[in-house]
Regions:
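Conserved, mostly hydrophobic/aromatic
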Residues: 9, 19-21, 61, 74, ...
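N-terminal binding-site loop/beta-alpha segment at the start of enzyme catalytic domains
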Residues: 1-86
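Structured C-terminal cap/extension of enzyme domains
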Residues: 9, 54, 192-290
């Protein structure tokens, strides 16, 4: 396959690959383990996954402060898997006390062993109070703006598992450059939020399309039949990526081979309309059956 296509990531003006490497499945643990407890086997697998991503053009790597050992392990791996086009993103949750938020931000930079993040997301604006903690005067966003002024953070966005109206309100605040949100074939209710992000010229990053999109990495036999001749991962990726409001989707790879079906989807993107239509009709017939 040729170089992975990119899309303009909204007003960030970054050219972001259609596939992003999500760092929530290749780490050893969901606990932030001490360095001495991370095994060589786990680290070798993470580095192999990262290197395959680099080789195939997944230049955007995304993790989070509360993804267990992910930040620490990536901090070791990134210098060993060099990428001149890398875009690094992490996510830190809002706090009632901005000093607590800044302390976690410092820890993210320490774990990742980096001097700058291209992208920082406020992690989990799921309730109105999370948005208020972020945007109020002297809140968490003021910390981010200071770090941006110091050149340590490029662009700021937010991630969310919250209701559509809250996501839309967060987009319409004008404070964020991009959004990480759920939207895929089996869950299209966030479409108004995609519209709001487009209207604000925000980058749009679809999170967890394989897991929350229907546990597509372990599909049922019935799901395989409904998506035939496509794998469910390929079908869902094509559904997401054919929408111009979407700029990139997360690939939460646990090992190098987990990239394969997503790469297949991108290679068939020009055929998306013809490939998706018969599968969608099959789903519609299934849903209409008594």
């Amino acid at each position: 396959m040729a170089a992975l296509p990119t899309r303009r990531f909204g007003r960030t003006e970054l050219e972001i690959p259609l596939l992003s490497l999500g760092g929530m499945r290749f780490q050893q643990s969901w606990t932030d383990l001490p360095a001495g407890e991370i095994t060589a086997e786990s680290q070798v697998n993470l580095e192999a996954t990262l290197q395959r991503a680099v080789d195939r053009g997944l230049h955007h790597v995304e993790t989070a402060r509360h993804y267990g050992s992910s930040e620490r392990q990536l901090g070791w791996a990134l210098p060993r898997c060099l990428d001149d086009h890398r875009l690094l993103q992490s996510k830190v949750p809002p706090r009632a006390n901005p000093a607590d938020f800044e302390a976690e931000l410092e820890l993210t930079f320490e774990r990742l062993n980096c001097q700058r993040l291209d992208l920082l997301a406020i992690h989990g604006i799921n309730l109105p109070e999370h948005l208020e903690q972020t945007l109020r005067p002297s809140g968490c966003m003021d910390v981010v703006r200071r770090w941006q002024a110091d050149g340590r953070i490029g662009h700021v966005g937010f991630s969310t598992h919250g209701p559509t109206d809250l996501i839309t309100a967060s987009c319409n605040s004008g404070a964020f450059d991009y959004v990480n949100l759920h939207w895929y074939y089996i869950r299209q209710d966030n479409s108004p939020a995609l519209d709001a992000a487009r209207d604000q010229d925000m980058g749009v990053f679809i999170i967890s399309p394989t897991d929350k999109g229907g546990h597509l990495h372990t599909p049922s036999q019935r799901l395989l039949e409904l998506c035939d001749p496509l794998h469910p991962i390929v079908f869902n990726d094509l559904f997401c990526l054919r929408d111009p409001r979407v700029h990139t989707i997360s690939v939460g790879a646990s090992c190098p081979g987990d990239l394969d079906l997503h790469l297949e989807a991108v290679s068939r993107l020009d055929e998306a309309a013809d490939l998706i239509a018969p599968v969608s009709r099959g789903f519609s017939r299934q849903l209409s059956m008594p």
